[in-house]
């Protein structure tokens, strides 16, 4: 073959070292020097015979060879070109990069270095694993031929650096060097593995121009590019036009069909393949098995694996590994471990990927015993030094909570990569050991390994889970400046979710706004993290802001986002807009129906809730736990005890669901609201739910509203025994005991221990006006309250004298009376809402309170809604009150 190369401008390949100056030699100056004519031939440098170096290299005496080279250099002697090449070959065989570097530094030991010798030097560096040095030699070469380019491309191929292979091809074309039929497949392999289909198309055109289309090896490589890059149409057309097709070509096009989910067509191709006289080989079967697993059809893949035996083809390690990884990918992890066991029984030796897959299954299942067994197998079979196996073991032990074992494996991994460090850091973060995680995070950088985006995100997530959002924010701010790693959408989502998790909603919303001005826009995860934080009356405006972002980003096409919006609008007080979103949804699942049904129940609208329930059943949607608890509450609002009881008993009988605490609590509410307290108490005893605080709180509400002091005392005694340290509970119990004593009831239970020192919880209310949240406290003495709000509060309040029993109701409140503790916070909030919205034709005042609203404030809110013609939405710890025209949605039961 003709040598193809393009000369380039001369470059200094290396700085030659001049021989040492001979001592005591006279200094000769040009001017005084006389010409000395001599007709004798100049003496050539000493040439060391090849036999000496051959002997040293054959016996592995590379140290002696190195000394001999140094001696030659000092003497100014030379070695033959063939000797130098043999020395380089010895370095390759022995992997002696040290001697190789010495040979490079002594490049002047032979007189005429050429492109072949330089290419050999390049190969030496590449095969010894020093690809950066190989590239330096390549870039410094005075001329490069086809063999030079082949050596460099081969070096990158061995390192799986496929993008560099594609880049070198482009440089090669610029230099005017054309690949041959041996180099084309290597370059095409690089294009296929890095997904560079455009480079593959360029090579395809070059191949046609060079007339190499008939070369089967090259054609198969072109087909592989189209197949692996997902270009099914190109692959099919090229395959059909191939003059000659061997089993490799058929396998490539089969792979293309399987990767594109066309498995039935792939099976038909196999039949066509057999008609052409080509028998499907092991690789063909493996492709089909892998394809079915990828599609989630593991049973079909298993059938194929059994069927191949009837064709006389025995499954190899790749078949078993494809089956094991396919089962894991499709969530069938126990079956995958069983397949791993069967593989051993079949006498097939696993490879590193098989071990890694088995460890992954153990990790997901958190079966530490089986994981330890796989670890032992990895040690016995020599896979423990494989970095991928080591990484999977670290991950498995970390997820199983065995951090000491994980650390032992981590420390034993010799060539740790970023994933090794990430696995151990993740383990520490998940266990709450952020200090140890940060120590590794620092050590990783000291080891000249830069943390990637996963490392930073893991550290941020760890601090957030530990409740230390300050450290999380510090890392969030440092990562781009110090770590040179750009934040991604997941980073923003983590920090936003962290602030929400730790109760810092305002900071989370501010970050959300900043995120929209960054390179990475919010996604569905961002929205789903934020919306629950807005699911209260103060979040109404923020919900609309988030909804605007959803529309701008076209996230409303995501079903989960629409469900969340339906739920959040209802909880933030806008049930009508919640219904609008619901009606606009083409597909409605059980979560969609539950969101609006629950919203109607929250707003006290039992009629629409029951109508939706019937409509849902008509459309064939089966109710779940959440649906049924909402419907029992709806019947409670309606006062229809018998229908509520039917729904409760249908939970187990019709829907085969075990009734949960939420259903029992709803039933107690149902009985209590209907003043059927004896039945409620009997239900509590029958269901054996006496140890649940929410049950007695619901029961006590019925006792309080209907004025049954004896039942109230019974409920109070149970509440106090369950939560003796709860201040709110103790306050209520104290009031009931005091009222019972006043009414002459004998008290057998233990009284609260802090009767004299008891302080009731401080009432607080919040209201949003002009995008600012204002806080008011009971007995507030701020300038705003004393100068502006007190007169209005006095004006709008009905100051009736109240007794311990008001219309038959027991006067038992979480908050102290206004005569002793001052005006309650919600009255200040209502007054501030009225002042701030004066002049508005239709006003809705939204207030959030931390305690149960007392009867006096409840009556005041009804009066204000009628007197001033405004709607008041007030959410306390019991329910959402909607005051309108002098009425409340709770029907005075809360």
UniProtKB/Swiss-Prot annotation:
Transmembrane segments: none annotated. Keywords: Repeat. Disulfide bonds: none annotated. PPR repeats lie at residues 80-110, 114-144, 145-179, 180-214, 215-245, 246-280, 281-315, 316-350, 351-385, 386-416, 417-451, 452-486, 488-522, 523-557, 558-588, 589-623, 624-659, 660-694. One of its GO terms (cellular component) is chloroplast. One of its GO terms (biological process) is RNA modification. Gene3D superfamilies: Tetratricopeptide repeat domain. Residues 771-801 are annotated as: Type E(+) motif. One of its GO terms (molecular function) is mRNA binding. Pfam families: DYW_deaminase, PPR, PPR_2. Residues 695-770 are annotated as: Type E motif. Residues 803-894 are annotated as: Type DYW motif. PANTHER family: DYW DOMAIN-CONTAINING PROTEIN, PENTATRICOPEPTIDE REPEAT-CONTAINING PROTEIN. Belongs to the PPR family. PCMP-H subfamily. This is Pentatricopeptide repeat-containing protein At1g19720. It comes from Arabidopsis thaliana (Mouse-ear cress).
């Amino acid at each position: 073959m003709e040598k193809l190369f393009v000369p380039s401008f001369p470059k200094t390949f290396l700085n030659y070292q001049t021989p040492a100056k001979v001592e005591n030699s006279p200094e000769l100056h040009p001017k005084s020097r006389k010409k000395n004519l001599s007709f004798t031939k100049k003496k050539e440098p000493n040439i060391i015979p090849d036999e000496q170096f051959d002997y040293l290299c054959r016996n592995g005496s590379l140290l002696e060879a190195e000394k001999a080279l140094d001696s030659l250099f000092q003497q100014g002697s030379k070695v033959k070109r063939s000797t130098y090449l043999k020395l380089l070959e010895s370095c390759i065989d022995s992997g002696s990069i040290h001697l190789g570097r010495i040979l490079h530094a002594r490049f002047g030991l032979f007189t005429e270095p050429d492109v072949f010798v330089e290419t050999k030097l390049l190969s030496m560096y590449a095969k010894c694993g020093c690809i950066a040095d190989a590239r330096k030699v390549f870039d410094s070469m005075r001329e490069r031929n086809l063999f030079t380019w082949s050596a460099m491309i081969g070096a990158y191929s061995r390192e799986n650096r496929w993008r560099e292979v594609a880049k070198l091809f482009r440089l090669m074309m610029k230099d005017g060097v054309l690949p041959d039929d041996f180099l084309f497949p290597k370059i095409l392999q690089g294009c296929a593995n890095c997904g560079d289909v455009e480079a593959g198309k360029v090579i395809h055109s070059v191949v046609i121009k060079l007339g190499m289309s008939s070369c089967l090896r090259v054609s198969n490589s072109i087909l592989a590019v189209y197949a692996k890059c997902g270009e099914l149409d190109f692959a099919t057309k090229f395959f059909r036009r191939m003059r000659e097709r061997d089993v490799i070509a058929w396998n490539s096009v089969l792979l293309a069909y399987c990767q594109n989910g066309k498995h039935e067509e792939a099976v038909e191709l196999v039949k066509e393949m057999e008609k052409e006289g080509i028998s499907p080989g092991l690789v063909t079967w493996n492709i089909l098995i892998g394809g079915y697993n990828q599609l989630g059809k593991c049973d079909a893949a298993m059938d194929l694996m059994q069927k191949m035996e009837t064709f006389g083809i025995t499954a190899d390690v790749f078949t078993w590994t494809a089956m094991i990884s396919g089962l894991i990918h499709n969530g069938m992890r126990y079956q995958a471990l069983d397949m791993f066991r069967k593989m051993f029984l079949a006498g097939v030796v696993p490879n590193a990927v098989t071990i890694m897959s088995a460890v992954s299954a153990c990790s997901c299942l958190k079966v530490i015993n089986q994981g330890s067994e796989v670890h032992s197998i990895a040690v016995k079979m020599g896979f423990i030094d494989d970095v991928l196996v080591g990484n999977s073991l670290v991950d498995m032990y970390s997820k199983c909570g065995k951090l000491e074992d994980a650390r032992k494996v981590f420390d034993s991994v010799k060539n740790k990569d970023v994933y090794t460090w990430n696995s151990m850091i993740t383990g520490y973060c998940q266990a709450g050991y952020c200090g140890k995680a940060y120590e590794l995070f620092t050590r990783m950088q000291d080891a000249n390994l830069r943390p990637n985006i996963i490392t930073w995100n893991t550290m941020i997530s760890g601090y957030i889970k530990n409740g230390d959002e300050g450290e999380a924010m510090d890392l969030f701010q440092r990562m781009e400046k110090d770590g040179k790693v750009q934040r991604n959408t997941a980073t923003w989502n983590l920090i936003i979710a962290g602030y929400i998790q730790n109760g810092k909603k305002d900071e989370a919303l501010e970050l959300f706004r900043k995120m929209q001005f960054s390179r990475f826009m919010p996604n569905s995860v961002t929205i789903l993290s934020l919306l629950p934080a807005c699911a209260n009356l103060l979040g109404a405006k923020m919900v609309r802001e988030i909804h605007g972002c959803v529309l701008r980003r076209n996230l409303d096409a995501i079903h989960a986002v629409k469900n969340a919006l339906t739920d959040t609008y209802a909880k933030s007080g806008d049930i009508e807009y919640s219904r609008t979103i619901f009606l606009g949804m083409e597909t409605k699942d059980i979560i969609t129906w539950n969101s609006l049904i629950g919203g109607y129940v929250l707003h006290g609208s039992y009629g629409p809730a029951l109508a939706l329930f019937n409509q849902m059943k008509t459309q064939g949607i089966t109710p779940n736990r959440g649906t049924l608890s909402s419907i029992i509450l709806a019947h409670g609002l309606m006062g229809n005890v018998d229908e509520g009881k039917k729904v409760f008993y249908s939970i187990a009988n019709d829907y085969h669901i075990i009734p949960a605490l939420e259903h029992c609590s709803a039933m107690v509410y149902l009985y209590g609201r209907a003043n059927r307290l004896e039945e409620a108490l009997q239900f509590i005893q029958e269901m054996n739910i006496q140890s649940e605080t929410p049950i007695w709180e619901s029961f006590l509400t019925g006792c309080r509203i209907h004025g049954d002091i004896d039942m109230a005392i019974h409920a109070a005694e149970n509440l106090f025994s369950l939560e003796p340290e709860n201040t709110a509970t103790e306050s209520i119990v104290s009031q009931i005991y005091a009222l019972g004593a006043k009414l002459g009831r004998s008290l057998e239970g233990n009284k609260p221990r802090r009767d004299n020192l008891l302080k009731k919880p401080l009432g607080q209310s919040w209201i949003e006006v002009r995008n600012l949240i204002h806080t008011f406290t009971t007995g507030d003495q701020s300038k705003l309250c004393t100068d502006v709000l007190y007169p209005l509060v006095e004006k709008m309040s009905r100051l009736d004298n109240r007794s311990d029993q008001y219309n038959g109701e027991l006067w038992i409140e979480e908050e102290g009376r206004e005569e002793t503790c001052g005006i309650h916070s919600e009255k200040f909030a209502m007054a501030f809402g009225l002042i701030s919205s004066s002049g508005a034709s239709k006003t809705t005042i939204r207030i959030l309170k931390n305690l149960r609203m007392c009867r006096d404030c409840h009556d005041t809110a009804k009066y204000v809604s009628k007197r001033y013609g405004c709607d008041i939405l007030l959410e306390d710890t019991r329910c959402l009150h909607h005051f309108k025209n002098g009425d409340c949605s709770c029907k005075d039961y809360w």
